[in-house]
C-alpha cells in the first residue's frame, strides 16, 4: 500500500510539473488601451500566472496587438503609430521600432506574406507595411471608416463600420472586387472554413439605443445571412474562435453562434457584470475577458480554459482591450 501511495504521489507531481511547464512555455501579452489623450497605454507580459514585464506609456490608446514570428506589433490609435518589438523569453526588447502612420488613426490589422495590412479611420484606407523594412509601401482607399480586417490568403475582407458593407479586396491588384451588404455597423470579422462571420453594433439616430446583430457571408457562394437581435440583448462586438467554433461577447461572457446566427445561451462561458466586460478574445486554449468598472486602472483580466474554468487572473492597467500569445519554443 505504501508503494502504491508513493507511486500515485509521484504521478501527481509529474503531471503537475507538466501542467506548469505547458503554461510556462508561452508568453501572454495584454494591451491596456489607457485613457484618451493621456498617452498611458501599456502592455503587460505574463508567463503563466506571473507578470514578468510591463511596458508603460506606450502612447495614446493601443487599439490592437498581434504576434508575428518573434515580433509583437501594436497599433496606437490616437498617437498614429505602429510599434514593433522583438520578443524573447524575458519579454519585449526595448525600446523597439516606431513608425508614424501620418495621423491616420490605425485600428485593426492582418498579416499576409510579411506585409501588415491595417485599417485607418482618419485616412479611410488600408495601409500596407513591409515587415522587413518597416516602410509603409502603399495604401488601398475605401469609402468610410474601415474596422475589422481578415484574409483568406488571396483577398482582404474589410468591415466598413461607418456603413453597412464588407469589402472584398484582391491582395495582388489592391482593388475592391466585391461589396457585400451585411447590415448596419459591421465591426469584427472572423473566418471559419468558408464562412465569414461579422459582428455588428450600431446606434439609434439620437444615440440613446444600441443595437446588435450578426451577419455571415458564404465566401464561395456569396450568400449573405443577416440576424438582428432583440432590443435589450447586450452583445458587444468581440468575436473569437474557440474549439474551431465562432463565439461572440454576450451578456457578460462569450457564447457560440448557431448556424442560424442566433446565440447559444446555454454554452456561454463567463458571467461577469454586463457593464464591466470591456473586451474578450481567445488564443490557443486561453479565453480572455477584460473588465473595467471606471475605465481607470488597475483593471482585471480573467483567463479561462476551453472548459470555461478561470485559470489565471491578471491585474493590468486601464481598459484591457487586446491579447496575444507567443510560444517560447519558437
Residue ranges of each PLM-predicted region?
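Bacterial Sec-dependent N-terminal signal peptides
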Residues: 2-33
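Conserved beta-strand positions in repeat-built beta-propeller and related beta-rich domains
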Residues: 26, 30-38, 74-79, 118-122, ...
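Structural motif
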Residues: 37-44, 81-85, 125-127, 165-167, ...
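Short loop/turn segments that connect beta-strands within beta-propeller blades
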Residues: 47-49, 86-91, 130-134, 170-174, ...
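Beta-propeller fold detector
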Residues: 52-58, 93-100, 137-141, 177-182, ...
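Blade-loop segments of beta-propeller domains
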Residues: 53-110
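Repeated scaffold domains used in trafficking and secretory/extracellular systems
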Residues: 59-69, 104-113, 144-153, 184-193, ...
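Intrinsically disordered, low-complexity segments enriched in Gly and acidic/Ser/Thr residues
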Residues: 228-297
